[in-house]
Amino acid sequence: MEKKYFGTDGIRGKVGERPITPDFILHLGWAVGRVLAQGRQSKVLIGKDTRISGYMFESALQAGLSAAGVDIRLLGPMPTPAIAYLTRTLHAKAGIVISASHNPYYDNGIKFFSSAGTKLPDEIEVAIEAELEKPMQTATSSRLGKAERVVDAAGRYIEFCKSTGPASVDLSELRLVLDCAHGATYQVAPEVFAEMGADITVIGASPNGLNINENCGSTALESLQHKVLECKADVGIALDGDGDRVIMIDQRGEIVDGDDILYIIARARQRTSKLTGAVVGTLMSNLGLEKALATLGIPLMRSQVGDRYVLEMLQCNGYSLGGESSGHIICLDRTTTGDGIVSALQVLVEMVATGHSLYELKSGVVKYPQCLINVQVARSINLHDNNAIINAMQEAENQLGDEGRVLLRPSGTEPVVRVMVEGRDISQVNSLAQQLAQEVAFHLGNPQICP
């Protein structure tokens, strides 16, 4: 059954436009209660990031769950991975996150964790949507759910993050700059690194409900780069609005992205004989990562784009480490979902253990130039049914040989085909990408190429 509301990462959109409206979220809370938390002793956790609309949707979810007879535990502003962890350790039936991740403040969304702290399977999302088609029926007064705050939520998560590194690790020799994106990590992230001894300078930690991800965080790195150089710091750490992704900056002010971080952690796990099987990336992971891992004898498997698919491939194959270029890093030997704080900590631990700088640790990955062009299309189409496009792809692949890749990928959320070409020669890469983009635009009937 095709889903009407759920995308690859829950439900997301612009506040005030359906489905991101108070009445829909009220109904959603009731539907979730009906599906996930049946039974008198059921409880569901609710956490949020720092968007101003989070208060409104928290109240709506709370009312809907209560109407379904479900007890609620309120976490307040809390990183997405913290909600996954607390859902599991507090033995809740489900965890609900109110966040639109790295999006601007005027967007918001709802995503869910199962009792095991993992994302919901498709069949549960389908069941929730089926309940949404029914009118709400409020439980009798004696069976309404109650709400309480979890007063030690932040402390529990801080201790968990610290526990993902060796007990003896001391970060006192490291000078860090931490950018919390005015988001959900603004309280807990500084505490984690400070309690482990690091000398930290914090930016992006003054949320006002409207400034989340605004010129800060993992998608806007300029301020952090400047601060790292100004403070002569060893490392910059940029988290996103809900704390599930991280990008780092080395002492030279250069970006260390998700591919670099994945390589560093993989090499660290291999060094300590703790790497399980292959590393999982995505179709967009840089070819340089694949080549670098190959020199270590570590295979790279590629999933569809999206941390949900990375996690599925990890679980299906019994692997422990995967991630995306965007900074979603999943360390299944430490936690159940992408966690920016935990991932950054693994890198810092490796710096201390080896005595190497972040620049030195990432130097094993030589990135291949990559050109990505978005082509607006008039209609959805199976690209593999178009012989002209297939022939153009094959010709580009032949020109690149073993030293490049071509990827054409329809967007799952907008009428766009993403054309990506990767190779050693940047001029060849750009030329082939432009040729393929023009071919796609010509055959799909809306010859407009977006930046």
Swiss-Prot record:
Cofactor annotation = Mg(2+)
Please name the gene that encodes this protein: glmM
Q: For the modification Phosphoserine, which residues carry it? A: S101
Q: Cross-referenced PROSITE patterns, in alphabetical order?
A: PGM_PMM
What's the name of the protein? Phosphoglucosamine mutase
Q: Report what the Swiss-Prot or TrEMBL entry states about this protein's PTMs.
A: Activated by phosphorylation.
Catalytic activity annotation: alpha-D-glucosamine 1-phosphate = D-glucosamine 6-phosphate
Q: Which PANTHER family match?
A: PHOSPHOGLUCOMUTASE (ALPHA-D-GLUCOSE-1,6-BISPHOSPHATE-DEPENDENT), PHOSPHOHEXOSE MUTASE
- Reported EC number(s) for this entry are 5.4.2.10
Keywords of the record, alphabetical order, are: Isomerase, Magnesium, Metal-binding, Phosphoprotein
- Any Pfam family matching the protein: PGM_PMM_III
Read off the NCBIfam families from this record. glmM, PRK10887.1
What's the stated role of this polypeptide?
Catalyzes the conversion of glucosamine-6-phosphate to glucosamine-1-phosphate.
| One CC-aspect GO term | cytosol
What family is it from? Belongs to the phosphohexose mutase family.
- Which HAMAP family does UniProt cross-reference here? GlmM_B
Q: Tell me the organism.
A: Nitrosococcus oceani (strain ATCC 19707 / BCRC 17464 / JCM 30415 / NCIMB 11848 / C-107)
Q: How is the cofactor bound?
A: Binds 1 Mg(2+) ion per subunit.
Under Gene Ontology molecular function, one entry of this record is: phosphomannomutase activity
Per UniProt, Mg(2+) binds at S101, D240, D242, D244
Per the Swiss-Prot or TrEMBL record, the active site comprises S101 (phosphoserine intermediate)
Tell whether Amino-acid biosynthesis is among the UniProt keywords.
Answer: no
The enzyme class is isomerase
What are the GO BP annotations of this UniProt entry? Answer: carbohydrate metabolic process; peptidoglycan biosynthetic process; UDP-N-acetylglucosamine biosynthetic process
